[in-house]
C-alpha cells in the first residue's frame, strides 16, 4: 500500500537527517523493531524521505541516518510526482524466488561505488505501513532489489558484503576513498 506522507520530491540544501558512511559502526548494528507506529515514527519516515530525495536516492534505511529502528523508505520513481513512496516498518521477507538476478547496485552510504550483486528476482514481504497497518507486498524488478538492499541495512549488512568480485570491490572502494577492511563478505 502506498505511503501518504506529504513530502515534496525535491532536493533540500539542508536535508533533515545526516547520512552515515561505510566504516561507521552504526551501519553494522542490527536495528530494533518498532513497537508502536505513531506520529514520531511518521516524522522519522518523512525526514528519511526528504533526506533520500535530497541525496538522489531511491531507498534509505533508518540506520543510514543513525536511527536504530526497523524503518525503510523506497521510491523507485523519484522523478514522478504521482508515484507514492513506500514506507516499511518492521519488514520481513516471507518468501523469495529461486530465480536470481545479477544487477548493479549503489548505496547512499557508499557514494560513487556501483557493483553487481546477485539477489532473488522476486520477494514477498510483510511489514507495517506508516499508519501501523499490516501489509504484504509481492515485488519484482527494481522494487524487489531495493527492498532487499534496504532490509539488509536493518540487519547490519551492506551491499558490498554481497559482491562476489573481491578484486573489483577493493579497487572501487579505494577509488572512492573507502577501505575494504569495512566489508564483511557473505559466503555465496
Swiss-Prot record:
CDD domains: Pep_deformylase (cd00487). It comes from the Bacteria. Gene3D superfamilies: Peptide deformylase. The active site is at 150. InterPro entries: Peptide_deformylase, Peptide_deformylase_sf. GO terms for biological process: co-translational protein modification; translation. NCBIfam families: pept_deformyl, PRK00150.1-3. Belongs to the polypeptide deformylase family. This is Peptide deformylase.
